From Swiss-Prot:
Keyword Transmembrane helix listed: no
Cellular component, GO, one term: membrane
Entry function: Involved in the biosynthesis of lipid A, a phosphorylated glycolipid that anchors the lipopolysaccharide to the outer membrane of the cell.
Protein name per Swiss-Prot or TrEMBL: Acyl-[acyl-carrier-protein]--UDP-N-acetylglucosamine O-acyltransferase
Enzyme Commission number, as recorded: 2.3.1.129
Residues forming coiled coils: none
GO BP term, example: lipid A biosynthetic process
Recorded family membership: Belongs to the transferase hexapeptide repeat family. LpxA subfamily.
Subunit relationships: Homotrimer.
Pathway(s) annotated for this protein in UniProt: Glycolipid biosynthesis; lipid IV(A) biosynthesis; lipid IV(A) from (3R)-3-hydroxytetradecanoyl-[acyl-carrier-protein] and UDP-N-acetyl-alpha-D-glucosamine: step 1/6
Gene assigned in the entry: lpxA
Subcellular location: Cytoplasm
Length: 262
């Protein structure tokens, strides 16, 4: 049976699984869907066309599914879709998408979103991502799986942060961070491969060595970006265990619209 505190407001039309728990003074809007075993903390607001999957935990005073902070927004029925097993802590704000993009903000599975984080409209957050307290994502930001964003960091709109990368605390990021790379500073600069993170996630020594070689080609050998990309493509077909990782590294760089940190 759904456990809804008597002071909570669940508007008609909301689809709430019978195992959901909703705390005191929380508000759930009419276009919200909440999956099994999800917990909504006290004073939280879940609104808009928002879908929450299973086993999510929403902290006190979180604002999930609010209108985009975009002056072009004209109350179109855009969406927020959140997957399973996410922890979203106190005072976090996550906004729906805009029609100027694809109309949906997405958050995958198993993410750890700490207090006071902001995830702007049209952001795409992958799986197993950690967003530390007060990290701020502007609109249209993309974050790959297993990325870690340090506290008090600001990420410019349309920036892409690659899988398994790490952004240090209090950083200002205005260009893309390739996968597997550590970045930090204001403005953020590259500081090597995220070796410890890759070891923890089961990357082989050979794969890590190949990524270190890729990093040196891109950042340490004095090559232009185009020159580095030629050599990176050769490294990606070297026949070793790191080929797939280096290929992902090169493909991310090729797809960059804002340019990568250098």
């Amino acid at each position: 049976m759904t456990r809804i505190h008597p002071t909570a407001i669940v508007e008609p039309g909301a689809q709430i699984d019978e195992s959901v728990e909703i705390g005191p003074y929380a508000i759930v809007g009419p276009h919200v869907t909440i999956g099994a075993r999800t917990t909504i903390g006290s004073h939280s607001v879940i609104e808009g066309h928002t879908t929450l999957g299973e086993d999510n935990r929403i902290g006190h005073y979180a604002s999930v599914g609010g209108r985009p902070q975009d002056m072009k927004y004209k109350a179109e029925p855009t969406k927020l879709v959140i997957g399973n097993r996410n922890t979203i802590r106190e005072f976090t704000t996550i906004h729906t998408g805009t029609v100027q993009d694809v109309g949906v903000t997405t958050l995958g599975d198993d993410n750890w979103i700490m207090a006071y984080v902001h995830i702007g409209h049209d952001c795409r957050v992958g799986n197993n991502v950690i967003l530390s307290s007060n990290a701020q994502m502007a609109g249209h930001v993309e974050i790959g799986d297993y990325a870690i964003i340090g506290g008090m960091s600001g990420v410019h709109q349309f920036v892409r942060i690659g899988a398994h990368s790490m952004l240090g605390g209090a950083s200002a990021l205005v260009q893309d961070v390739p996968p597997f790379v550590i970045a930090a500073g204001n403005k953020a600069e590259p500081h090597g491969i995220n070796v410890e993170g890759l070891r923890r996630r089961g990357f082989s020594p050979d794969a890590i060595s190949a990524l270190r070689s890729a990093y040196r080609l891109l950042y340490k050998n004095g090559l232009s970006l185009e020159e580095a990309k030629v050599q990176l493509r050769e490294l990606a077909v070297a026949g070793g265990e790191g080929d797939a990782a280096v290929t992902a590294f090169v493909e991310f760089i090729d797809a960059s619209q804002r340019g990568i940190i250098r």
